[in-house]
Amino acid sequence: MELLNISQSTLSRAMRDLSATVTNFRVGRTPYYALLRALPGGINPRQRISRILSTGHIDHFAEVEFLAGGGTLEITYNDGVRLYDGLPPYMSFAAPSGFLGRQLAHSVANRNMFPVSLKDWNDDHRVAFLFTEAVNLAGNLVFGDTCLQSELNFRKYPLVEAEEKLEYYVGMAQQLKTMSYGSSAGGEQPKFLWVGRDSGHVIVKFARRGSRMADLLPLEHLAMRSLAEVGVPTAETELLASDQFVFLEVRRFDRVGEQGRVGMLSAGAVDDEFFGKRDTWPEFAARCVNAGYLSKQDAEHVSVMAAFSELIGNSDRHFENISMLIADDGEYQGIAPAYDILPMRYASIGGGVDPELVPIEPKVGTIGSGPRVWALASKAAERFWSAVMTEELAAPISRPMRELAERNRKVALDFAAPFLPV
């Protein structure tokens, strides 16, 4: 006040007069003032966030204010005020990314506020999308009143009957295969979201028959089943095939019935917020156990997922491929069911190039030598490669992949043998 040569009351009156563009808040006993951000399309920088509970009921989550310079002010009923340097982790997680994200960017590109390419989006574009266009996001948060109304409208959409589903899937695949949405990362799987009467909420991956990815989708189905058989929770999957395409339905574990939802955050969002490491799955799980976010059982499941990945050639173990569930009370509920675990070392690398079908090369990495972890992973891997060798599925597995499975089964079992309980 001395530097400004004004009284506190004069400053307060000035701030009230500027309330449309300036906000004030306290961190502890210290008052702060901040300029609100100008967002694309003139979107209000003050917004509400709701959440959909597992029962389908809608609850208040937080109010947010977007500040000049990129910060975000979060106001909740329980925890008071929190200031983030950028977007809160749940917004970064919910923002469009990957193949689905490029679909969304393409669909809103006719609005002047959004660049055509997702690569050109910044946080302002992400905020604008989340609070004007986002519907049916991962997790249970709904951003803004406009999107809340869209979610209520979404509940009224008629569900497609099971016998009509494959026809719709083929139509979606035909439409999406002609759209690149910008340069796709090598091996990234085309997919779309679906709600069916028989399947519920699913993510549908697809590939043209005869392609390498058409070989790998049945393997993802078998990998999920093999992990589940040794006690690791996994996403439920189902294979379908038409004359042209192979489809893999992955049941969404963040959905409960037709209307209920479960909160979730990727390991990347959690790690960025609390640890800033992004090293390996087992190390992340160990940190979460120490912080009280995960149980030792959860950490063991993560280690089994990592060890199993080594034994099947899953080289794509980034921090968006495991997630944590959040209960209705806002507490971490545990590790999410396993998903996106398959032999990605054989996935197409772009430009029509497929890696050679050579045997896997497992490594210990940071998994350690725990006998129970390797016993479970080895058992799952044996079941997996045996199924790849012999099982007849709705979508066929090629002869070269079946022949490779026999060699990989031996490599996996030989590698795990020294770690197994005596």
Q: Language-model features: where?
A:
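Phosphate/dinucleotide-binding and metal-coordinating scaffold of catalytic cores
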Residues: E2-F319, S323-V422
